Amino acid sequence: MEDIFVARVMSTSIHTVTPDTLVEDAAQEMLENGIGSVMVVDDENHLEGILTTTDFVEIVAEQKPKDQTPVSKYMTTAVVTTTAQESIRDVADAMIEHGFHHTPVVDEDEGVIGMITTSDLAGYISHVQSPSPAE
């Protein structure tokens, strides 16, 4: 796994919103696309934060009006990111260490270019053929 890079397994079909997007609209984006997170970006596509299904637990618990509340109120801003050139082993280790399921893939010039998830990693591992046991 050490020689396999994030670019090989990441999803480039990304879903983004802006910090002023309403929570209701972000939730609709996630539901319509069957995804567990949206990345929050500025006008130049640089990452500002991430909003995940876990954040909606807090939104529901606080009973905030979802049609009036921007995602900036609930998004995580201290986001651990990776690059397309990073080893998937390093990314997997970081995801386990921090207990999260989504890692945005960023490029210094282009901003957000993809997402790698625990599902992406599991999908890759399930397609890798293991060597046969020595006889």
Predicted regions span which residues?
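Tandem CBS (Bateman) regulatory domains
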Residues: 1-12, 52-81, 87-98, 112-135
